[in-house]
Structure formats: structure tokens, C-alpha cells
Amino acid sequence: MSGTHKKLGARHKARKRAVDFLFEAEARDLDPVDLATERAELSGKDDSVAPVAPYTVTVVTGVAENLDRLDEVISSHLQDWTLERLPAVDRAILRIAVWELFHATDVPPVVAVDEAVELAKQLSTDESPGFVNGILGQVVLVAPQVRSAAAATSRRAETADGESNDARS
């Protein structure tokens, strides 16, 4: 990135808002999906509340639904650290990026990593961008296999649903 400010796209802003919601939910011991949904509803009624992009809700929901697996993957790539020791904002950034790497098929892996590093630069410590990049550099190597397995599982579930619907007919 050059010395000029990079124009931030809608997805970047949505990811940043997702980090905010995940961070706030963890700090306040709230359900992140409820928090994002309530803010989205409130923003429709109150102009003083910033709008919540649909992608923000998608990301927060995806992270919440897959939290245990995401944390397991992140933890497996930490060396001499535990997930709990990471700054909360770094946890939120990593969770979003790993969710995108594994589940957001419309997001190229390089974009998920670059966005996470950019968010770490904006929101966290001086060491965080390199740390986030290092962890995601390892995770990105297994992402294609995880995506393939998820797609196969989804296809099997759809086939099973179709067969059970046929049996009821």
C-alpha cells in the first residue's frame, strides 16, 4: 500500500463492523448474532445508529455458528500462545478471516488475508499485522481441503434431504 489512503470498500467496512460486534459481544458476554441483528434493526429505526451491512450480519453469524472449529484451527497454529492470551481484537480478526477462508466461497483467500492484515493495522498493536499474517499464512494452506470437505458434506445433506422428500411423496 502506498502512502496515500487506500479507498475502503463496502466489504472492508462490513468486516470492520463485524470485528466491532464480535469484540463488543465478547467483552459484554452477549450473543454476537443477537447484537448484530438488534443493531441492524435499530439502524432502520434510528438515523443516529450507523447502518449494518448485510455482509456484517453474515460474517458475525458465520463466525458464531462455527466458533469452536474456528478457535480450534487458530489455536492449532499458535506457537507458545493460547487463544485466550491474544488481544481480543486479534481474536475477532482471525476468526473472521478463518471463517472467510473456510466458508466464504466468493472471497479469494488472498483477499481474506489482506483484509485481516489491514484490519490489524488499523485496530490493533504494531505487532499484530505480522502475527495475523503469519497465522493466516499457515491456515490458508489447509483452506482448500476444508472448503472441499464442507462442499461434499453440503452435497450429501442436500441429496439426503431430496431422498427423504421423495420417500414422503
Swiss-Prot record:
CDD domains xrefs: Terminator_NusB (cd00619)
UniProt-listed SUPFAM superfamilies: NusB-like
Keywords (A to Z) from UniProt: RNA-binding, Transcription, Transcription antitermination, Transcription regulation
A biological process term (GO) from this entry: DNA-templated transcription termination
Pfam families named among the record's database cross-references: NusB (PF01029)
Molecular function in Gene Ontology: RNA binding
Gene: nusB
Name of the protein in its database record: Transcription antitermination protein NusB
Family: Belongs to the NusB family.
A single Gene Ontology CC term: cytosol
Family annotation (HAMAP family): NusB (MF_00073)
Function in brief: Involved in transcription antitermination. Required for transcription of ribosomal RNA (rRNA) genes. Binds specifically to the boxA antiterminator sequence of the ribosomal RNA (rrn) operons.
Lineage of producing organism: Bacteria, Bacillati, Actinomycetota, Actinomycetes, Mycobacteriales
